[in-house]
Amino acid sequence: MKYLNDNIRTLEELKKAYHRLCLKLHPDVGGSDEEMKILNAEYETLFERVKNIHANTDGETYERETTETPEAFQWLIAELLKLDGIEIEIIGCFVWITGDTKPHKERSKALGFRWHSKKCCWYKSPDG
């Protein structure tokens, strides 16, 4: 593998690594289409291997079936990278967006994000 490490053990690790690499390789942030094609192919391969393997807060792994597809997460990250002034953070199975999110309120809702009033940021849980 050129970009992703074969030692990735869980879906959460894979998503974090993919997001980190998208911030470098996506064409909207200075990367190239060819680099993203390679990264996406690697993501899809590893996704099939770890899609049902998750980690709890103690770092112990467990299995739980998912209906998520690799394309859905790739599409979500690509859409978020188009929004100016936001920070994307992946914590466990959740995707959080912070920063200047107010101009992107309707788009965030359309992408399936919910507003967390106590943390004052948007989040998307694995089940929608």
Stretches with model-predicted labels:
Residues G30-G31, G99:
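Glycine-centered flexibility motif
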Residues H26-D28, K51-N52, W122-K124, G128:
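Short amphipathic alpha-helical segments with coiled-coil-like heptad repeat character
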Residues M1-N5, T45, R49-I90:
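Post-J-domain flank of DnaJ/Hsp40 co-chaperones
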Residues E68-G128:
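Accessory regions outside conserved functional cores
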Residues M1-V29, I38-R49:
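N-terminal J-domain/J-like co-chaperone modules of DnaJ/Hsp40 proteins
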Residues D33-E42, L46, C121-G128:
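Short, Lys/Arg-enriched alpha-helical microdomains
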